[in-house]
């Protein structure tokens, strides 16, 4: 069967993945890449990828079925851009960053307008719908999340968090927020201004990323200590919670180098997920079988953001400096690029179910 970037006949059972078919985006950002978002509209025949960067810009690329790509439109903020998300219909993107504001870019007209503001940089922004009404939720270092109806200049609601917001994800009615001091807040968007549940991360070190399951029954947490946790929302499912080590080098002389988990993305169809880290590798996992499906060779730099497209045939990953080694690591020749990995064969398919003991 022909598919993205050619054939999809790869059915190797090896756990070592292949990068030889990966395609680089042309005209990449000029500074570290912070976030990726694909157009989610199933009726749009084309894939569009939005990319936010420390160079103060949001760029939107059109990606053809053979992997060829071109920049379509871009928008500039007044400071580094930390987050970007597509609207459900694929006609607009919303982005936010260090300039303490969120902006909406209309892809057809190229026009941008401010839609949100905080008292400190906005670290996260997500689009969602409330009763069919397009809305956004922003999370800031001012220790609040705010909800925005685009028809109003004032927030539709504000929630005070325990600490600065570092990461956030939305899936259906599930909103998960990760803050400083390892707090994890869970909100049911049917009751958006109160916490459904608050917990301390089961991981002992700083939270880098949270990502909601495809079925919105739970979420994954990644930390700076090369560890990932799988966490279910409801108390009745707590026995299925677990954590595992990842993005760690093979021990040398009893020393293990531990790398941050920078990004976690769930496959939209299979419910399997990826982790990517400061070590420059990404892996695909099956949480239900507690099994690593594929691991990939080092890509030559830290991976700062990842995303699957709407049908899971493309896995995009951003290579750029993540400051995990301080200013000394920020060399002039450090790569800054976005790669498109064609998801072939069984790379992301879950293992056949087996009876649990």
From Swiss-Prot:
Family: Belongs to the WD repeat rae1 family.
Subunit structure: Component of the nuclear pore complex (NPC). NPC constitutes the exclusive means of nucleocytoplasmic transport. NPCs allow the passive diffusion of ions and small molecules and the active, nuclear transport receptor-mediated bidirectional transport of macromolecules such as proteins, RNAs, ribonucleoparticles (RNPs), and ribosomal subunits across the nuclear envelope. Due to its 8-fold rotational symmetry, all subunits are present with 8 copies or multiples thereof.
UniProt keyword list: Membrane, mRNA transport, Nuclear pore complex, Nucleus, Protein transport, Repeat, Translocation, Transport, WD repeat
UniProt-recorded name of the protein: mRNA export factor GLE2
Task of the protein: Functions as a component of the nuclear pore complex (NPC). NPC components, collectively referred to as nucleoporins (NUPs), can play the role of both NPC structural components and of docking or interaction partners for transiently associated nuclear transport factors. It is specifically important for nuclear mRNA export.
Species the sequence originates in: Chaetomium thermophilum (strain DSM 1495 / CBS 144.50 / IMI 039719) (Thermochaetoides thermophila)
Stretch list, region Disordered: 1-31
Lineage, highest ranks first: Eukaryota, Fungi, Dikarya, Ascomycota, Pezizomycotina
UniProt repeat feature WD, residue ranges: 28-71, 76-115, 117-158, 160-197, 256-295
């Amino acid at each position: 069967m022909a598919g993205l970037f050619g054939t999809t006949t790869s059915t190797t059972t090896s756990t070592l993945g292949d990068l030889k078919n990966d395609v680089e985006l042309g005209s990449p950002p000029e500074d570290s890449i912070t976030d990726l978002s694909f157009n989610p509209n199933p009726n749009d025949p084309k894939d569009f990828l939005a990319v936010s960067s420390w160079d103060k810009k949001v760029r939107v690329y059109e990606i053809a079925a053979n992997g060829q790509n071109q920049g379509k439109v871009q928008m500039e903020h007044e400071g580094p851009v930390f987050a970007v998300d597509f609207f459900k219909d694929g006609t607009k993107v919303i982005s936010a960053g260090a300039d303490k504001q969120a902006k909406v870019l209309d892809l057809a007209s190229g026009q941008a307008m401010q839609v949100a503001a905080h008292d400190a940089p906005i670290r996260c922004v997500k689009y969602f719908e409330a009763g069919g009404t397009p809305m956004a939720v922003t999370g800031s270092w001012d220790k609040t999340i705010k909800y925005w109806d685009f028809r109003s200049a004032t927030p539709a609601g504000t929630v005070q968090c325990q600490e600065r917001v570092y990461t956030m994800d939305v899936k259906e009615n599930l909103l998960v927020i990760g803050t400083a001091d390892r707090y994890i807040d869970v909100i049911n968007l049917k009751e958006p201004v109160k916490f459904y549940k608050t917990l301390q991360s089961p991981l002992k070190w700083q939270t880098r990323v949270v990502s909601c399951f495809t079925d919105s029954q739970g979420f994954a947490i990644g930390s700076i200590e090369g560890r990932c946790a799988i966490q279910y929302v409801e108390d009745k499912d707590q026995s299925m919670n677990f954590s595992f080590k990842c993005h760690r080098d093979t021990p040398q002389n009893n020393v293990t180098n531990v790398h941050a988990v920078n990004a976690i993305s769930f496959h939209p169809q299979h419910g399997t997920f990826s982790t990517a880290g400061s070590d420059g590798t990404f892996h695909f996992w099956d949480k239900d079988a507690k099994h690593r499906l594929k691991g990939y060779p080092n890509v030559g730099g830290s991976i700062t953001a990842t995303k699957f497209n709407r049908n899971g045939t493309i896995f995009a990953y951003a290579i750029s400096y993540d400051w995990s080694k301080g200013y000394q690591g920020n060399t002039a020749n450090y790569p800054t690029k976005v790669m498109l990995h064609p998801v072939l064969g069984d790379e992301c398919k879950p293992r056949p179910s087996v009876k649990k003991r």
